[in-house]
């Protein structure tokens, strides 16, 4: 879609669930997006790095969101493997 200036713009870019790879629809009001930032261990301040997880409403409805977040965080190295 183009605006008045002739630039390409997207009105809506759908997100995908990080746990199940399902598309999160615009009307999925039960979905959440979590941003986990990297913290400097010496100063306790936020660094430039971050990781974002999107969990769809269906995963939350089944009560599996906490397990999915732990699994994704282990895979990305945020949580140790023997947690």
UniProtKB/Swiss-Prot annotation:
Q: Name one GO cellular component term.
A: cytosolic small ribosomal subunit
Q: Where in the cell is it found?
A: Cytoplasm, Cytosol; Cytoplasm; Rough endoplasmic reticulum
Q: Which domain of life does the protein's organism represent? A: Eukaryota
Q: Which PROSITE patterns match?
A: RIBOSOMAL_S21E
One Gene Ontology term of the biological-process aspect is: regulation of translation
Tell me if ATP-binding is a UniProt keyword of this record.
no
TM annotation in the entry:
none
Q: Does the keyword Ribosomal protein apply?
A: yes
Q: Name one GO molecular function term.
A: structural constituent of ribosome
**Which key words are in the record?**
Cytoplasm, Developmental protein, Endoplasmic reticulum, Ribonucleoprotein, Ribosomal protein, rRNA processing, Translation regulation
Concerning its family, UniProt says: Belongs to the eukaryotic ribosomal protein eS21 family.
What is the role of this chain?
A: May be an associated component of the ribosome rather than a core structural subunit. May act as a translation initiation factor. Has a role in regulation of cell proliferation in the hematopoietic organs and the imaginal disks of larva.
Quaternary structure and interacting proteins, as annotated: Component of the 40S small ribosomal subunit. Interacts with sta.
The name this protein goes by in its record? Small ribosomal subunit protein eS21
Q: What is the lineage of its organism?
A: Eukaryota, Metazoa, Ecdysozoa, Arthropoda, Hexapoda
Primary gene name: RpS21
């Amino acid at each position: 879609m183009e605006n008045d200036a002739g630039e390409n713009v997207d009105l809506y870019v759908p997100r995908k669930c990080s746990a199940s790879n399902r598309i999160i629809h615009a009307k999925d009001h039960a979905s959440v997006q979590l941003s986990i930032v990297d913290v400097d261990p010496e100063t306790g301040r936020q660094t430039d790095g971050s990781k974002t997880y999107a969990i769809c409403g269906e995963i939350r409805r089944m009560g599996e969101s906490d397990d999915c977040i732990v699994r994704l965080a282990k895979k990305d190295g945020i949580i140790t493997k023997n947690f």
